[in-house]
């Protein structure tokens, strides 16, 4: 069993990762130099990839695709591990883009950043941080105007699942 298949603290390459069931995780994937993640076809592939297993393997709470990085805010369900899912996202997105574009371009840098959030207050702030990323960068005035984000989808009826709350909250605080 390798590091992406078991829970706990993993130190690979540059960044340590803490993977355990039912944690609120803010994950950032960075693009390789020269890759524009908001190219419309690529951004759609990315969005399809991260939304595909929503409410099956994880509860997707927020995301934002920026030109050179991708924010994903998620709670993995009890049988799922972050490392395995991140690897699958990156592999599927890259393979699909290579087929569509006819290139052998690698999309993401090898490692990723993750931070697990410990409180509902941190969770709320993380969603705001992720969805306001394009506003802070000067791309749009309102988060709901950034096409490649959960804020845009929320303005059009998408709702993050609440299935994660029983997994995260200690008994007695539900």
Regions found by a protein language model. Give the residues of each.
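Short catalytic/metal-binding and nucleic-acid-binding patches
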Residues: 1-174
